[in-house]
Amino acid sequence: MATLPDVNLADLLAEVESDAEVTHVPLCREEEGIGICTGAYLVGKKCAAIMQNGGFFNSCNAIVSTLLQYQIPVLLLVYYAGDIGDRTFSTSGAMTEPVLQALGIRYYILRDPVDAVELIKRAQILAEDARRPVAILLTKEGLGRRSVVPSL
């Protein structure tokens, strides 16, 4: 798994780091993860990139010119900053789904941590069968964190 540290993903990244069955590759920039995942796929490995949606936006050129162009199945686990109930980065939140749609990348939204394992398995199978990236948008609730609820 190729990851970039992020406070919202800290618990997930700690799990990745501690899993002996996972090769963890920390990144400096998210688009590096697209190249690393491509290389892993070309030698027969499954790979996922974990990033925030801002990093996903930064990676769009690499996603289009590599993953989509050469039909590389990579699972994109993207923290959904600015999702409903998350008062940070509202512009990023508003643009995340339209950008995925414009790129033709199928995506699913994880809102309950109970669904995580099954959703990841199914998304990985879809990516492999379609030979395309598939994204899972990780919400605060989906990661088991409380949503920010404003007082009215």
Where are these regions (language model features)?
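Thiamine diphosphate
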Residues: 1-152
